[in-house]
Amino acid sequence: MKRTKQINHASFRKHWRAYRMAPVALAVGAVFVLAGCEKSDENVSLYMNSDDCARANPSLSEQCTTAYNAAQQEAVKTAPKYASRADCVAEFGEEQCTQVPAQAGMAAESQHSGSMWMPLMAGYMMGRMMVGGYSQQPLFTSLAANSPARGQFVDARGRNYGASTSGRSMTVPKTALAPKPATTQTITRGGFGETVAKQNALRSSSATPHRTMGG
């Protein structure tokens, strides 16, 4: 019996240590802690531009502009890149593409003026950080009829955040706001669309349980 008590105590200490080390950032802004949901989920808002953000949040006008400008800079680094305008337009539609400006963060061989094309930033995701301030990520959308990103907000990794409607709020994994790796190589026509389609499939297979649990 004494030995059994010792084993139980050891098990209790093990579980207590695991609990003590669990992340404490479970309530950032309006985060909902739901059974079965990721512990790092948080609320974000999606806007097409800083004006939409400022109208929805008059007291945060400066933060809206700062986040928008930062998202634009991030878009240049992380957006999918194409070797020609035609390849970009095929995926995103007319008036949706621009030449990639040369910048220090990209490989030297990729900095030739006009050598690559990228989609224009269609909006941005904005969320409050635990340490104060706001974090952001650029969002893109497609006007191409056959694109899985048509009329949707997607990030540089192809993750879909629903209709490209400004002013929406939603709960996302904190990883959605994490910095994305710079894109310095071009992709083939249709490559980004395939990525979006795969992300959509993953989302449909994993999001339903999260939505139903906890109401």
Curated annotation (Swiss-Prot):
This is UPF0441 protein SG0265. Belongs to the UPF0441 family. InterPro entries: Biofilm_formation_YgiB. It holds the Pfam family DUF1190.
